[in-house]
Amino acid sequence: MSRSTITYQPALDGLRAVAVTVVLFFHARLGWMQGGYLGVSVFFTLSGFLITSLLLAEHAATGTVKASAFYTRRARRLLPASLVCLSLVCVLAAAGAFDGITKLRRDVLGAVFQVFNWVKLGSGETYADITAAQAGLRRPLDHYWSLAIEEQFYWVWPLVFLGLLAWCRRRRTTPLFTVGVLVAVFSVAAPVIAMVWGPDAAYWASPARIA
């Protein structure tokens, strides 16, 4: 199997459309869409599926995964729009468009270094804070929290993927068994994080989201 065998799947675009719609309805503060924030989890799941499919296809075709090429492709896809948005926000902030410039500087750094979700967790902010009325005018970069989690996944997962393949070869363990163990471990990660560090940690923290 090669990269070219991964054909376009319209059903995935349909899921994306549904996820976008419910998130937009949620942020529009429609009373009947209180669970719309779960659309973000759909995006994370789709990203994990697609990225893993690409890695599996590349490994099947070439016998390895070129992490540097993977990172380059992800950067070309994500960074241009992200940096344009950051630059525009900085220009508008310099013109006095936003309040709380100190916090905005912190948020810009969190977005640039792809740790925005950890910035939010460390500041003690909740998801309710970024969905409050007029929050977008006070914190124009809050949407970077989900992008940061995706970017962290993109950095880590190819290396973990290669490590798992090497482990399976050395131990003569089937990949399916190894994946099953990982699923079992991660299935309890989010509840444990929520129990020990609270529900906000389960929402912001990357390990809980990967789970």
Each model region followed by its residue ranges:
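Membrane-interface helix/loop caps of multi-pass membrane proteins
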Residues: 1-211
